């Protein structure tokens, strides 16, 4: 056996091993399991959380088993279960977002597709530092990973370093459907399950919609190849991504610039454009913003995590609006107290001593002191 034959034999052995592992990952996560009435029934009880007060959800739940059986039969006979979208706009942190929500009958199917099919198979291929839309992860997880990366960098190099912060322009609206399908085909063996998932993607002429669980999960896995390339080819262990936001901690500014050029080129291949007004290279000692928090690495190695100024201003304004609605009798005082406790609870996890004092003072001025003044005046 010559060298070429040995290489070919080794390749075939490794390919067979990968195919076997792929087959094992897909066991129990097939089209038949996803579309079974029992899976759909469990998906309904999970999907109704937080929205059980809606009349449409209650109507579906009255005959949940009958509805699940009918839906299962329709899917297996190749019928289209889509009833169109419920479209509306919301304002999130001053940014207008267009939401495309689906009816409860379709949401149940999406829940089953995600929980019983896509997520158990595809999440195993994600890097650990991909923190969005996964059980046990989230914004707090992403912030803690950043702090851990900064501590690791400091122990090795001190504060002499830079961080590349990246942000994408119109991320959901730029996603290529062919790449989404290619990513699923790499991990999922059941073609019928892939076709079912694509039924929730294809109605969008371009990109993916906000408000769909399937679209949310597929967006998380969209740049998975780039994530692995940064971690394994570039050997950047201090890299993390949260949906369309990412960071890389680098030794030098030139290294960060080289990575930025790679991201611009690679993201362009995926149809995504980096928002260069928000993408920046910052010296670690200068402080930077990550997921709405202002982060500082001090010369002692201590990390200061302060809430972003924009979120503080936004919540102060919201508290003032709530106070006006309480005065007009539109909402009870308990609503204001709930918002105040929630905001203080968030700030208590930050280095925000003065911010907490300012919120306390504002709440007292809006509610407590004014109430006491009126009690004295009318006594």
What are these regions (language model features)?
Residues 1-9, 13-14, 102, 107, ...:
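Right-hand nucleic-acid polymerase module
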Residues 144-243, 247-264, 282, 330, ...:
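Conserved polymerase palm-domain catalytic core
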Residues 71-95, 108, 115, 189-203:
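Reverse-transcriptase-like RNA-dependent polymerase core
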Residues 96-127, 205-232:
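Conserved pre-motif C helix in the palm subdomain of viral-like polymerases
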Residues 85, 240-244, 277:
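Short Gly/Ser/Thr- and Asp/Glu-enriched loop/turn motifs at secondary-structure junctions
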Residues 30, 114-173:
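Active-site-proximal segment of RNA-dependent polymerases
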Residues 57, 61, 136, 208, ...:
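Conserved phosphate/pyrophosphate-binding and hydrolysis machinery centered on Walker-type P-loop NTPases
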